[in-house]
Amino acid sequence: CSHSMILYGEDRFTPAKKVALALTHLIQTQFAGDSLKLVLFHDSAEEIPLGALAGAQVGPYHTNTAEGLKLARRLLLAQKKDMRQIVMITDGKPSALTMPDGRIYKNAMGLDAYVLQQTLAEVTECRRAGIVVNTFMLARDQALVEFVKMVSSITRGRAYFTNTMTLGQYILMDFLKRKTRKVS
């Protein structure tokens, strides 16, 4: 829910919420034995109740992907489930990081090497914990696409590339089957 979701006159937040609401409905109705937690990440990360998703608003300016993944990992490890996965809906650019002393390091200029390194370290922690990260990417910037490819490759997850105009169609990169296909 970072501010980047509404930058440059393009609302990526509303489509992201639509995807999250649809996934929530699917899981609650078709996979009733599964549990679902929602984590919003911006300058930091927070868990929100399922009922609060529809009313969620764009938050602070930066995207602390590492903190969002860390919180999601903690929530998943607290549950006694065989299959653990994170479904991340993002516009892709990690631009903030929580430092060991609690301060937030922010850099919105390009992909900051330190933020990227620490974010990928958290992705690796997810993999070590047996957590797959599947990503819905709502942007087409090549650097961000490459970042999402790295996340998916590390965790053997899937990456779905779309935009706000073609949310019903997306490009699926399946890192388990090593295939790419267009889905409508």
Summary of predicted features, one role per range:
Residues 9, 32-62, 68, 74-79, ...:
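Short beta-strand-loop
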Residues 26-33, 77-78, 124-131:
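Arginine/glycine-rich "motif VI" loop of SF2 helicases in the C-terminal RecA-like domain
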Residues 1-20, 91:
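MIDAS-like acidic motif and immediate structural context at the N-terminus
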Residues 39-42, 89-90, 136, 162:
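Generic beta-strand/beta-sheet core signal
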Residues 58-63, 92-154:
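VWA/integrin I-like adhesion module and closely mimicked acidic/polar interface patches used
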Residues 53-55, 132-184:
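Von Willebrand factor A/integrin I-like adhesion domains
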Residues 14-29, 38-39:
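An active-site-proximal "capping" alpha-helix that borders the catalytic cofactor pocket
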Residues 85-87:
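Structural motif
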